[in-house]
Amino acid sequence: LTPFSYGITNMHIMVTNDDGIHAPGILALAEALLELGTVTVVAPDRERSAAGHSLTLHAPLRVFELREGFYAVDGTPTDCVNMGIHNLLPVRPDLVVSGINHGPNLGDDITYSGTVAAAMEANLMGIPAIAVSLSTYERHGHFDAAAEVAVRVARQVLTNGLPADTFLNVNIPDCPANEMQPPLITRQGTRSFIGKIVDKTDPRGRKYYWIGSEEPEFNDEPGTDFHALNRRHVSITPLHLDLTNYESIKILSGWNL
């Protein structure tokens, strides 16, 4: 691979993920983004899917430089963003791109996603950020095609900026580029939860459990991320950090507290 510290413009892009530094998605993404500028990769040293916005506070972190501009951190995606911005990068990045995730990050599931959380952390630090996911769990998905989409979105962000308190959640169908439908700006969808705990017994008679054994069923509503992706559109959802339910403020203000 090309050394990631070299690029063709003065833009500096930081890349991270939650699937780990050796995942094919992050390798395809980092290579593709080189056409926009200098790329530094700071990613977990192993799988950290569903880590959410967790931050390591009660243990030391270790960093391993695998090659120039390519760092593995024994922490979460949020740890990686902090380490990159505050310690490893020589300059403050112009953009943080998290991905390419193995599997979509849609609807309510973004609250679990380490991929989305990394972009959220960058947004908290005032840095434009994009989370990118491919709708496949296979290692041989169309990551190169997804990386091309990520570059197009990143170029728009670097050129035009983003509205205040906004980062992007991009979900890409797993198909060749010529089979993708035009990108759509979408809203976050919802799903019907089918939460299930599977309990088993090991050979020594002790119980163990698996969480989340069934695929989620998303509500296929027009305008949502799921609806777009299900029809092979690239879904681009603008997200922000304010979780306040403003309509509920009016209702709760009438409580006799």
Task: Set out the residue ranges of the language-model regions.
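Alpha-helix C-terminal capping segments
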Residues: G84-P90, A117-P128
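A cross-family phosphate/adenosyl-ligand binding-site feature
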Residues: I13, P24-N87, V91-R92
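Short, Asp-centered acidic motifs that coordinate Mg2+ and/or phosphate
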Residues: L95
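Glycine-rich phosphate/pyrophosphate-binding loops
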Residues: N123-A145
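Electrostatically charged, flexible surface regions
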Residues: D144-L257
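Short, Lys/Arg-enriched N-terminal segments with co-localized hydrophobic residues
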Residues: L1-N10
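Short beta-strand segments
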Residues: T16, V42-P44, D74, S98-N101, ...
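Glycine/threonine-rich flexible loop motifs
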Residues: P104-S113
